[in-house]
């Protein structure tokens, strides 16, 4: 079996999830709440109609909306673009798993979107994906 270090040189595309649940930037937070309930992921890439990454929305963002909604229930009608994180970190498919690990450790994020050069989301990689790669000794 290959050493855990061997898995660090493999490309992110070898461990990423390709079937990504994405959120359109204009949908209301009430719909995001339903999506989060259905899929139970911590974060979701937010995309434009063209599929380009514009942000990420997390369960933490939903908690902020919940707090704001205590005094104003109409806050759930606001678009996700109002509440999401902008300028998010992302990986490219050919980035190494080592790069992904470093970004996650340095940023404290649990997952990172994977995008092509044109900004279109092609996958997502989580801490579990990376741990599986290292434990499994995935290598070139």
Predicted regions and their residues:
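A short beta-loop-alpha structural element at the N-terminal edge
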Residues: 23-26, 92
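Short, basic/aromatic recognition patches
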Residues: 27-34, 101
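Generic detection of intrinsically disordered/low-complexity segments and helix-coil linkers/edges
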Residues: 33-38, 77
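A glycine-centered beta-loop-beta connector
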Residues: 36-39, 44-61, 104, 112-129
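Tandem CBS (Bateman) regulatory domains
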Residues: 1-19, 58-92, 96-109, 121-140
């Amino acid at each position: 079996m290959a050493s855990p270090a061997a898995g660090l040189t493999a490309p992110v595309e070898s461990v990423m999830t390709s079937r990504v649940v994405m959120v359109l930037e204009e949908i209301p937070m009430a719909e995001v709440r339903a999506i989060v309930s259905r899929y139970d992921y911590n974060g979701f890439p937010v995309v434009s109609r063209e599929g380009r990454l514009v942000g990420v929305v997390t369960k933490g963002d939903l908690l902020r909306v919940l707090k704001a909604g205590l005094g104003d229930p109409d806050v759930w009608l606001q678009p996700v673009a109002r509440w999401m994180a902008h300028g998010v970190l992302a990986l490219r498919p050919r980035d190494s798993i080592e790069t992904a690990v470093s970004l996650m450790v340095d940023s404290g994020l649990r997952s990172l979107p994977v995008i092509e050069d044109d900004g279109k989301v092609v996958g997502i990689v989580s801490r579990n994906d990376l741990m599986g790669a290292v434990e499994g000794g995935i290598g070139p």
